[in-house]
Each structure stands twice: as structure tokens, then as C-alpha cells.
Amino acid sequence: MESMVNDPTVAMFASLFVALVLAAAAIPKLRSQDEFLGVVANYKLLPGFLVAPFAKLLPWLELGCAIALLVPSLRVLAACVAAALFMLFSFAIAVNVGRGRTHIDCGCVRRPTSMSRIGMFHVLRALALAGMSLYVAAVPLEISGISIESALTALASAVMLSLIYMAADLMVGFPATKHKLEIYKGNSND
């Protein structure tokens, strides 16, 4: 087990996966900045004068971390910043879930038809991403020790898991899926 934890292929996979998640979160926010401003305001955690600067800065910080995770000399710092961001997201979501404000949009991966509401799943997901980011920061990655085959395996695995991650987030946001989930929870309005 220890050899797998310290395996450079696993470390490369984790770095690429976190980078892809951060990029996938940042790019739609940059495209729809006004909408994301509303999402940040809906969390009701920041004083009004900080909402706009935070909403403008966050996607750039996410994108910067995503890029920096691919630069060996910046990888550890970027992973630490990413872990802090994911812990911040977890805290913000948990506070609102605790307040009973689960009707607000997560803001995780923005899209025009987003209906993704927050819940404990989002808290746990953000904590898992924080844990993976801390793993990236803790495990050294020696690129020279990775074969081409291992690097391609890490890349393919990271891309596939990122696509699954985004597809799951997208599917939960579809109105029909949301309705079916509410029926299973016993919250149907029918």
C-alpha cells in the first residue's frame, strides 16, 4: 500500500485531476461573471462590499491553481492553495446547509441550466478534493521517474475521472433528475 501512496503515477494522476476540476470550475465562472456574483451573494457569508471582488477573484485563483499544478516548481504551493479553497468551499456550504439554505446553487461548476442545490454531499465532495490536494502537496513528484506509459495512464485516468465528476454534477442539475431524486427522498410535490 505504501508503494502505491508514493507512486509517482498516482501523484501525477492526482495533480492532473485536481487541475482539471479547478479549470472546469473556473472557466464557466469567468464566462458568466454576473451570474456567479449572484451565487456568491446567495451564500450570505460575505459583507456586501466584498461579494463582487471575491466573485471576480475566485475564478482567476482557481484557474491559476490549475495551471500552477502543472508546473513542477509551483505544484506544492498550488496544491496547498487548492486545498485551502476546497476547505473554504466546504465550510461555506456546510454553514448554509446548517442554516437550512439548501435551495441555493452550489456554484461549483457553472452552467446556464444549473439547478445543483447544496447538501452534505457537496461538503463531503469538497473535503475529498481538499484531501486529494493535500496528497498532491505531500507526495513528491519526480517526472524523470515516470515512464511515458505511466504518464499517459495518469493523464487518461485524470481526464476520465474529471469527465465522470462533471457528468455527475451536470446530471444532478437536470430538472427531471432533480425531481426523481426528490421522489426517492420522499419530497415529491406531486
UniProtKB/Swiss-Prot annotation:
Record membrane topology: Multi-pass membrane protein
Biological role: May be specifically involved in the processing, transport, and/or maturation of the MADH beta-subunit.
Name used for this protein in its record: Methylamine utilization protein MauE
Pathways involved: One-carbon metabolism; methylamine degradation
Recorded GO CC terms: plasma membrane
GO biological process, any: methylamine metabolic process
Native source organism of the sequence: Methylophilus methylotrophus
Swiss-Prot/TrEMBL keywords: Cell membrane, Membrane, Transmembrane, Transmembrane helix
Ranges that cross the membrane: 8-28, 49-69, 77-97, 126-146, 154-174
Major location category of this protein: membrane
Listed Pfam families: MauE (PF07291)
Compartments, as annotated in UniProt: Cell membrane
InterPro entries, per the entry: Methylamine_util_MauE
